From Swiss-Prot:
It comes from Listeria monocytogenes serotype 4b (strain CLIP80459). The keyword Magnesium does not apply. The keyword Oxidoreductase does not apply. This is D-alanine--D-alanyl carrier protein ligase. GO terms for cellular component: cytoplasm. ATP binds at T157, S158, N297, T298, Y299, G300, P301, T302, D389, K498. InterPro entries: AA_adenyl_dom, AMP-bd_C, AMP-bd_C_sf, AMP-binding_CS, AMP-dep_synth/lig_dom, ANL_N_sf, DltA, DltA-like.
Length: 510
């Protein structure tokens, strides 16, 4: 099997040229069209970009077929891409642009009116369409394509300083991940994959590349649909899905609809979950509703290419453990549980930090050598990553035991609580704050902000909360904004003078 992602995707243009690689809301893109358009765009980039190929290309948009064309065209020109979704606030986009130092900023949709990109060329949607037309029929030099350990994509995740970090994923990383998904999860040719996550979220890689590499069809549910439950419940059975890829929270939302079942979705027999804890209650209800389906629980950080462990969730597994296991490590990886202080590898049954070693592990953070050295290291010639996750191995399965720091998963998004706190402290009405995750059914249900406010003239607390949220939305993504607000005159402190987070946590999670 060829190791080139692009060659394997392009091969479907010969095998099944008219089969849709993307289909949604009347928009259809065939494998032949994907190849021709990405060839044209790759040719355009090779002829017009003279900058260092180490500099990535930012692709701005939202789950459209044009984003796929831009991704693959960038790869064919030898440059990694950075997906940036339209839902991101302007300040976040500016932070990513500054950190990535891109060679080009591609707009597959219009930029917000209050965002101006400087310091690199910008390609508008009209210019992109014009480039595809002018270079139609051209084929870029295969030698120019991203290969081996070259960066393939870079996804920005939450950083503890308030600035996002760019995780570099190479072609080799992506090949390892994609081969594992297709083989271990028994995904055959021509299946229809749900695309729930925006491309700026690495969960999307779990549907995008397994779909394209197996000659399948990517079926996105964009933000206009997922924001309206009636539309969502109507659309899901209409899409004739075979493979479900989402966060558990999204499945919980769909399970609120009594019609979300096997009868109305007869082909839906593969469920793949990642991004947060899969509760036993969710898995059990899915098995009730979809008796023909196979459910997989997976685990992995962005730094190890989406996911590295898997377990098939059966009634026996649900009944055997108090919480669902994360599964077993993929064949070309090793997993150690280590003592966080000494680095000593711990035996089965002891809790410690999860360390991942092998083919899926990223080379590090783009343009951030110090942050890279803090968590990435060489282990006997293999790349290794300290996850900051606490875990334990029982019966050969990995079990998640929470975060060792202030990082959590909420609705599939990885969030540094310090990131939120640093951003909240920018708000004029906040003197000090602490963010506490409220737990429900073994996972984070919502974020609670405990706040010491500055002097203000609001009569009611809800008025203060509204004013704070109004400021926050200018520079923080919606999923990071706390849902509940508690106001205090002072915080409890530990003996060494730090905020007593255990005390605050016990208040929130009584």
């Amino acid at each position: 099997m060829t190791t080139s992602i692009i060659e394997r995707i392009d091969a479907w243009a010969e095998k099944t040229p008219d089969f849709p690689c993307y289909e949604y809301a009347g928009t259809r893109l065939s494998y032949k069209e994907l190849k021709r358009q990405s060839d044209a765009f790759g040719s355009f980039l090779l002829k017009t970009l003279n900058t260092d190929k180490e500099k990535p290309i930012i692709v701005y948009g939202h789950m459209s077929p044009l984003m796929l064309v831009a991704f693959l065209g960038s790869i064919k020109s030898g440059r990694a891409y950075v997906p940036v979704d339209v839902s991101m606030p302007v300040e976040r986009i500016e932070q990513i642009k500054k950190a990535a130092d891109p060679s080009l900023f591609i707009c597959t949709e219009e930029l917000p009116s209050n965002l101006t990109i400087t310091g690199c060329p910008v390609l508008t949607q009209d210019q992109l369409m014009d480039a595809l037309e002018k270079h139609f029929g051209e084929v870029p030099d295969k030698e120019a394509c991203v290969k081996n350990d070259d960066n393939y994509y870079i996804i920005y995740t939450s950083g503890s300083t308030g600035n996002p970090k760019g995780v570099q994923i190479s072609q080799n990383n992506l090949v390892s991940f994609s081969n594992w998904i297709l083989q271990d999860f028994s995904l055959s040719q021509g299946l229809r994959f749900l695309n729930q996550a925006p491309f700026s979220f690495d969960l999307s890689v779990m549907d995008l590349y397994p779909s394209l590499l197996s000659g399948g069809t990517l079926v996105p549910l964009d933000k206009t649909i997922t924001a309206n439950m009636k539309d969502l419940y109507r659309e899901i059975p209409a899409q004739n899905l075979d493979v479900w890829v989402s966060t558990p929270s999204f499945a919980d939302l769909c399970l609120l609809d009594d019609n979300f079942n096997q009868e109305n979705n007869p082909g839906l027999i593969h469920f793949l979950f990642c991004g947060e804890v899969l509760a036993k209650k969710t898995a059990s209800e899915l098995l009730n509703r979809f008796p023909d389906a196979v459910i997989y629980n997976t685990y992995g950080p962005t730094e190890a290419t989406v996911a590295v462990t898997q377990v098939k969730v059966t009634r026996e597994v649900i009944d055997a453990y108090p919480s669902l296991p994360l599964g077993v490590i993929k064949p070309d990886m090793r997993l150690h549980i280590v003592d966080q202080e000494t680095g000593e590898v711990l035996p089965e049954g002891e809790k410690g930090e999860i360390v991942l070693i092998g083919a899926s592990v990223s080379k590090g953070y783009l343009n951030e050598p110090e942050k890279t050295d803090q968590v990435f290291f060489d282990y006997k010639g293999y790349q290794a990553y300290r996850t900051g996750d606490s875990g334990i191995i029982k019966d050969g399965y990995l079990f998640f035991q929470g975060r060792l720091d202030f990082q959590i998963k909420l609705h599939g998004y990885r969030i540094e609580l310090e990131d939120i706190e640093n951003n909240l402290k920018k708000v004029s009405y906040i003197q000090n704050c602490a963010i506490i995750p409220k737990m429900k059914d073994e996972k984070v249900d919502m974020l609670v902000a405990q706040v010491i406010p500055t002097n203000h003239d609001f009569e009611k607390e809800y008025q203060l909360s509204a004013a704070i949220k109004n400021e926050l939305k200018e520079f923080m993504p919606a999923y990071m904004i706390p849902r509940k607000w508690i106001y205090k005159t002072e915080f409890p402190l530990t003996m060494n003078g730090k905020i007593d987070r255990k005390a605050l946590n016990s208040e929130v999670n009584k």
